[in-house]
Amino acid sequence: MKIKADYVNTPQWKELTVKSRLPEQLKCLDELAHNLWWAWDYEARDLFKSLDETLYEEVLHNPVVLLERLSYDRKEAIVKDKAIMKKVKDVYAKFRAYMDVKPDKKRASVAYFCMEFGLSQVLKIYSGGLGMLAGDYLKEASDSNVDMCAVGFLYRYGYFTQSLSMDGQQIAKYDAQNFNSLPIERVLDENGNPMIVDVPYTNYQVHAYVWRANVGRISLYLLDTDNELNSEFDRPITHSLYGGDWENRLKQEILLGIGGILTLKKLGIKKDIYHCNEGHAALCNLQRLCDYVEGGLSFNQAMELVRASSLYTVHTPVPAGHDYFDETLFGKYMGGYPEKLGISWDELVGMGRQNPDDHGERFCMSTFACNTCQEVNGVSKLHGWVSQKMFAPLWKGYFPEENHVGYVTNGVHFPTWAATEWRHIYDKYFDKNFMNDQSNEEIWHAINNVPDDEIWETRMALKKKLVNYIREKFTESWLRNQGDPARVVSLLQRINPNALMIGFCRRFATYKRAHLLFTDIDRLAKIVNDPEHPVLFFFSGKAHPADGAGQGLIKKIYEISQRPEFLGKIIFLEDYDMQLARRLVSGVDIWMNTPTRPLEASGTSGEKAEMNGVVNLSVLDGWWVEGYREGAGWALPEKRTYENQAYQDQLDAATIYGLLENDIIPLYYNRNKKGYSEDWIKVVKNSISTIAPHYTMKRQLDDYYDKFYNKQALRFKKLAEKDCRLAKDIAQWKETVAERWDAIHVVSRDTSLIDNGGETGKKYTMTYVIDEQGLDDAVGLELVVLKNNLAGDDHEVYAVHPFKMKSHEGNLYTFAATIEPDEAGAFRSCVRMYPKNVNLAHRQDFCYVKWLD
C-alpha cells in the first residue's frame, strides 16, 4: 500500500470555555461582573478596581476579564484582606437590595427595540448619540423599576476603533469581540442548549443565537447570526454596526424587527407597548400583524391593535438617518409576507411610501413606522416641530402643526454621567430623596449652599484628571506612530490644566460644523496664545467610514493643531468612546456645540456636561432651545441672518469669537484673592440649579409614560378586551366610511363669510347640509383659516372653527358654526370634512379629508 505524504481529516472544532475558579467568598463577584449595574454604580467600580488596580487598567475596566485573570495568590490575598472583603460584602448587599425590589406593575410594560445600546465601553454595541440615549434609557428603567425589556444586536466587531495617521487621516479598525469575556450570558432553551431563533426571509431562514445583557433589573436580548448554522452571506448580518451595503442593512432590520418579536415570543414575553427607537426596528410591527392575522383577525383588525400599542421615536431630520430600499431588494427578502397578512404586494410596499400608488418611490422604514405606530415623537421641542413638517406629506389633509407628532426631550442618566466628585457633592448637600426626585428643581437649588471654593476645587481636580488622561493617550498614540519625541514633550508641556478648557466632541458629520471655530485662523491664534488668559480647545469624534467630508474635517483640524501657534492649544483626541466622553464632559469648562439649525435633533452631550458644572456655549438648536437660561450659559442668536450657508457660518464664527473675547474669557479670569472667579462659579451654580434638573433620564422616562405609554396601554386594553370587540368595530367602521366616502356630498350651504368676506366684531353663521350616505353622524366639519402673508407653499393655521351638528333627517345632517372675526387682514379659508369617531386616537388615525366648496 502506498503511503501518502499526509492523510488528515477535517477537525470538528467545538467551543470550549474554561472559567477561572473563584474562592467561595468571592463567587458573588461573578454575579456582579455579569450585571451592568456596575457601569453606573461607582462603589461597585471602585470595588473591582481595588482587587488589582494595575490589572483593572490593563483589562480596560472589564470586570469579567479582571476576575478571569486574577492570579491564585491574589485571590487568596483578597480573601484575607478584611477591608476588601468588607467592601465585597457591602457592595453585594447593596446590589441584592436593588435587584430584589419587584417591578412596578401599575405602569405599562414596554418592549424597547434599538439598533445600538451604549451601556459601557466594555460592550461595544454602540456608535454614538442614539446608542448612548438607548443605554441610558435602560439604566433609568432599571432605577425606576419599570417593567421593560429590550432587543438589539450582539455585534462581533461593533463600531470601529479610531486612530489617526501622522497626517491626520482617520484609520478605522474593527476588532472582534470575545463574547465569553463580556458581561453577557447565553440564553438557553428548556433543554439547556443555546436558544436559536429562526427568522424567515423569503426563501430561507436565518438562525440567531440569543444573548442577554443584564442591565440592572432590565433584560436586554441581543441577537447574533455569526454562527455555523448560517451561510457565509448571513453570518455577517450582526458583524458591524451600520456596516456593509444596503442589502445587509435590510437584512439587519428584518432581524431586529421580525427576529426581535420572534425572540420575545419564544421567551414567552408579552408587553403592553412596543417602542421602536428609530425606524430601523419598524418591521417588528410587521411580525406582530402576522401574529394577529394568524390568530384569526383580519388585516385591518390586526392593524388597530398593532397601531394602538406601538410608538415610534424619530431621532434625526437628516436624510441619511432614514433608510430607503428599492422595491426589488425589499421583495427579495420580504416577498412572503403579503400572503401571511392577506393583502397584496402593492399594499405592503405602499405602507412604506408617502404616495402608496407611486411605484417609483422606494420603501422607507420611517414611513412604515409612522403608518404602523399610533404615536410618533421627536426628541426635543424644536425637533418635534421639525418632525411634524418632515412627516406632514403622510397626512395630506392636515397642516404640519395640526398632526399628532409629539416630542419628549432627551435626557441623560445622572449616575452614569455625573463624575464621582460631583456625586459626593450632591450626596452631601442635596435632599436624601434626590435620586428618586431628580426632576425637582427645588432640590437642585441646594447647589447654592455649596461653598464657592469647594466647587472650584472640584472643577480643578477634574480638569487635572482630564489633563493626565490626555497626556497618557497622547503618549501612546505618538509612540504608536513613531512621532518625534521632542515634539511630544513640547505638546504635553503646553497642556495647562489651569487654562480655560473648551470641548467640542461629537460625531463628525458636516452639519455639526466642527470647522466653524477655524473660520478666522488669525483671530483664533490670538485667543489661544494670550499668555495672561490661556485657552485650550479639545476636539474628539469619529466620522463614518463612508463619510469623506466628515473625515476631511478631522484631517483639517488635526493639521491645524500641528501648526506651531496651535500646538498644545488645539488638541484632537482619538477614538471618542464612553470612557473618554466621561472625562471630557466633566473635565472641560465650556461645552461647545455649533450645528446648522435645525439639524441637531437633541444633542445630549451638553446635558451630560451640565451634571458636572460644565457650562454650555451653543447654537439654539436641539435641547438647548429649551435649556438655555440667561446667566447660566451662552447661546448664539436663534434667528438665521443669511440664506447662504457660507455667510451664516462666517457670522456665527464671529459671534463665537466675540463671546469668547468679550464675555467668557474675561469672566473666567476675573479672579479673587483666593485665585478663582466668583462670577464664573455663579454661572456654574445657575447652570446646575436651573438647567440640569430638567434634563435627567428620570424626567425623560416619566415623560414617555405620561405622554404615551400609559395612555396607549389603556386604549389597547379597551381594544383587545372581549375578543377584540372594539378593534373589530373600529376596523369595520373605517371600512364602511372608506367605501362611502366619495359619495358623501354637500346638499346645500350658506357660506356668505368666506364667499363675500366680513368685518371684525360682527357675527356670521355658516351652515352646511351633508348627505352622509347612511352613516350615523360619522363626519365633522370645521372652517380652517390660514394667514395670507406667507410666501410659496408655507402655511400657518390662524384659526380652526368647528361646526356643530344641529339636526338631521334621514341621511341629511345640518351643521352650523358662528364666527366672529377679531382681526382684520387677508386670509385664506376652506371648510374641511373629516371622519368622526370618539374611539379614534387622533385625526391621523384615519386620515380621510374632503375640502368642501
Regions found by a protein language model. Give the residues of each.
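Catalytic cores of carbohydrate-active enzymes across secretory and cytosolic contexts
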Residues: 1-853
